[in-house]
Amino acid sequence: MKILILGAGGTIGKIITPALQVAHEVITAGRNNGDIIADISSTEGIKNIFKQVTDIDAIVCVAGDSLSDSLPAMDESKYSIGLTQKLLAQINLVLIGTKFLNENGSFTLISGKMGEKPVKGSSGKAVANGAINSFVLAAALEIPKGIRINVVSPAKVADISSSDLINA
């Protein structure tokens, strides 16, 4: 299976990439490192990835920033980080990537526990993560080519063992 991992240099990516490389062909992409250097917060960055890689069976996205602070300290620019770099980046990845993903391929996106169980001071993360969860539910109803789409919502990664994260 040929798998494209976006965010392979991040906390989760550094754990799942070696595990997937054992049995699959893995291509990595990221803002600062990877087989392909690309920023998925822009559609041009996403298109650049697919100019360099073809015949993809699965796309795994563990990339995307979001920010939280106390509600009185939040403003449009702070919300915009999660909306642009996490939510819209993953939506655009699906919209563009669907054209390049093989039939019966798979998207795995990432949200986070704050999308379902927010805590005080987490509204920035809650908005982006909750919207990703909703997008995946809606997209699954009509995504073409037999493609599957799912979202994982990890707890704080530092609290999860590597083996539990890989086998989740």
Predicted regions and their residues:
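Catalytic loop of short-chain dehydrogenase/reductase
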Residues: G82-L83, A89-L93, S106-L141, S153-A158
